[in-house]
Amino acid sequence: MGNFIRKLPGLRAWAQVDLGAVIHNFDEAKAKIAPDMRLLAVVKADAYGHGATEVAHALESRADMFAVATAEEALELRQDGIKGDILILGYAPDDSFDDLIENDITPTVDTLEEAYELNDTAERFGRRAKAHIALDTGMSRIGFCANEEGIAQIKEVCALPNIDVRGIFSHFSTADEEDKSFSLLQKERFSSVCAALAAAGINIPIKHLSNSAGIVDLPPCFDMARAGIILYGLYPSDEVERSMKLKPALSLYAKVNFLKEIDEGTAVGYGRTFVANKKTRVATLCAGYADGIPRMIARDGYVLLCGKRAKIIGRVCMDQMMIDVTDIPDVKIGSVATIIGRDGKEEITADEFARWAGTISYEILCGISKRVPRLYDKTK
């Protein structure tokens, strides 16, 4: 934890983001793909809770493209000065097309109706709108089907005069699992559709299929890969190999705002779910579920205080949580607890934190709320 954090007044809970780690992780991902492949940085959901604008600025000289989930996320990046290519991976409503075309943002097209609406909007502007085509190879989420009907529809999209189809992509649904058989089937389906389009004289310049799990665990394929969770120093699952030297980029902290000693038999928190079986010293932290700490975590979870693990007790409240610090006498009002991150020789990773909450690291990071300030360390 940077010493400068301790000197900042008025903070109750905060996240520290190491942009140098993000840059390092991007370079690690780049080294895993083929030299002639492009690498896209996924910064959707506020860069998985790390801050999309700050992450994009840090990677702007490296990333070939940025990806977001919504039109609002894309426009915010443009307004904050990001000049690189921005792809919207998810749904963009028709009434956003004017702004997207005007700001040179690339939407995803996954239906004919959407394509015709984008084409008509571009015609009004006197421009050709960029687009990527989504292909469903087995995720069953969005995209044209990987069959004859889907191929015919994609050909129709590519024939529209005011759409410049720059890319086509699909998404691995099980690449983070040990069994890669379905991922290989998805790759085969994707290749087959691209080959059928090429046979019809349609050569879409950027084909991309690999997500973070694909980058980590599968051979490089096609023209571009999409780095998501690995940018932030975390692996997609426990089932992928761990040969990359990833650095977690986010740490989460909260201050101790209250200390008291309770007697045996005294209950702590809502529902009286914890009852002390001995005299217990309790610290209250300034972080709760409104900050992104799941209520579920109280059963198994810990924080770090003074370089030691301290058990969460009682239910996590909206704005506070209670910790057993009986065996950590150095804790005082204003002490800083590490919720995710390292303190001395001890570390709580986002993955461990997520296991306590019965979820995945992605959800934990994205769930850290807006009221938690993000502080940035830009050294590499």
What are these regions (language model features)?
Residues G2-I23, E73, A92-D94, D99, ...:
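Active-site anion/phosphate-binding pocket segments in diverse small-molecule metabolic enzymes
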Residues K32:
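Conserved PLP-enzyme active-site core in the AAT-like
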